[in-house]
A protein has these predicted regions:
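Gly/Ser/Thr-rich loops at beta-strand to alpha-helix junctions
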Residues: 81-87, 148-149, 191-192
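Gly/Ser/Thr-enriched, mixed-charge loops and adjacent short helices
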Residues: 1-136
Length: 192
């Protein structure tokens, strides 16, 4: 989140706006990658999921994860809670790493989050919690919030608190390719 001093400065600047300009133009097809000219402005439509996948492949050992999914030593259940992380999880976990299609649930982003609340906790992600309590539960369960900056991590019938998950991740990041040189620092918010 932006510091309050920054957001206050932006708000103060909005008070000085005395005009704005409009341009009548056809709608831009955001599903077609490439550039579009809109007046004097060039708009570039990118695939953020593809870019994110490339970054994650640099940070994590995709070969090891893929091998674990293939040989059964790793199984995953991810609940996107009908938020923005769904397409990212489908692309990376299912399409790239080979997890079963049903390993990622509630993956289609919906304006109303499917009638639920995209808060990754035992109350709002109760479907995942119930799934992870089954006798043949996956080895790893996870859910994320509406914009993907908070998560819930679970093992088979085991809940990892947000503060513990941050500590576990920080303590073991050196094992990941993208963090072999160490971690510069971590930050936590009030909930963690």
């Amino acid at each position: 989140p932006a510091p309050e001093s920054f957001t206050n400065a932006i708000f103060e600047r909005t008070k000085t706006i005395d005009r704005y300009f409009e341009l009548e133009t056809p709608d831009i097809d955001l599903d077609r990658l490439g550039t579009v000219q809109v007046g004097d402005l060039t708009v570039e439509i990118i695939d953020p999921v593809k870019d994110y996948e490339a970054l994650m492949e640099e940070l994590f050992d995709f070969d090891a994860i893929e091998a674990g999914l293939r040989d059964g030593s790793l199984s995953i259940r991810f609940d996107a809670l009908h938020a923005i992380t769904g397409p990212y999880a489908k692309r990376i976990l299912v399409e790239r790493l080979g997890a079963p299609a049903d390993a990622v649930v509630n993956a289609v982003p919906l304006e109303d989050f499917g009638g639920g609340h995209p808060d990754p906790n035992l109350v709002h992600a109760h479907e995942l919690a119930e799934w992870m309590s089954r006798p043949n539960a996956p080895t790893l369960g996870a859910a994320s919030d509406g914009d993907g900056d908070r998560n819930m991590i679970m093992g088979a019938d085991f809940f990892v608190t947000p503060s513990d998950s941050l500590a576990v991740l920080a303590a073991n990041l050196h094992l990941l390719p993208g963090y072999r040189d160490g971690l510069k620092g971590v930050a936590r918010s009030m909930p963690t």
